Amino acid sequence: IALLGPSGCGKTTTLQMIAGFVDPTAGAIRLEGRNLLAIKPAKRGLGIVFQSYALFPHMTVAENVAFGLEMQGVAAVERAKRVAETLELVGLGAFAARFPRQMSGGQQQRVALARALVIRPNILLLDEPLSNLDAKLREEMQIELRQIQRTVGTTTILVTHDQAEAMALSDRIVVMNQGRAEQIGPPHEAYERPATPFVANFLGKTNLVNGATVRPEKISFGASGLTGKVRTRIFQGNHWLYQVDTDSGLVTVIRQNTGETMPAEGALVHLVWDMAP
């Protein structure tokens, strides 16, 4: 599950309330019938990966991962076994003796993930865990993180402001606005059938054409349709981003880069789209 929304919407506060770092002013937080508000944070059985990873710099990778097990009083033999298994799971089996300073950002992120998973938590909480990585590494880690989550099967709550990340990693998203959930559901459902104007405008780009909302990637250039003049076109690698002046206002168009010749700035074009859901 991904908690998604703009800065200040309450997603991180919600995660902190689940973790026990912030007390809600009213209500309850229930896990398997238990009210977590009556349980101390350390006893809630939650694994947490912080945005900064929060690794201990004076400990090796193995010692960092073992820390939670030590706090639980797990015997040394069992502790070593579970640490080794978890490091293999995240692809760091050969890095147990290294220190965090000797690891890349992506490797440190996996150490933090291993430390959270090794205690076998009821719920895994991820607080923008990929935000410190560069764009390419972030995409790679999204794939790895999803595979690991599928392998262990632990219920996971992810906080992110990155829409692509939320859609790539989650089975359900909670779109939040000013402390409220505007929509809860599968990512594709929230994107294709937004429940509120806020969700429609927040998830991706949206055009309002003749009273209807149309996603930019649903619009193509045709022989007839809504006539307009290309104001700007921007090449963004795998796609072209267009802004077209029409009688209905400025319309944004996104077309995949297929290698075909695309309209130039100043060209007259006709915009067409399918209104079917």
Give the role of each language-model region:
Residues 4-6:
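The feature captures the beta-strand-to-loop junction immediately N-terminal to the Walker
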Residues 19:
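Helix-to-loop junction immediately C-terminal to a conserved catalytic motif
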Residues 22-30:
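Conserved post-Walker A/P-loop segment of ABC ATPase nucleotide-binding domains
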Residues 41-195:
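ABC ATPase nucleotide-binding domains
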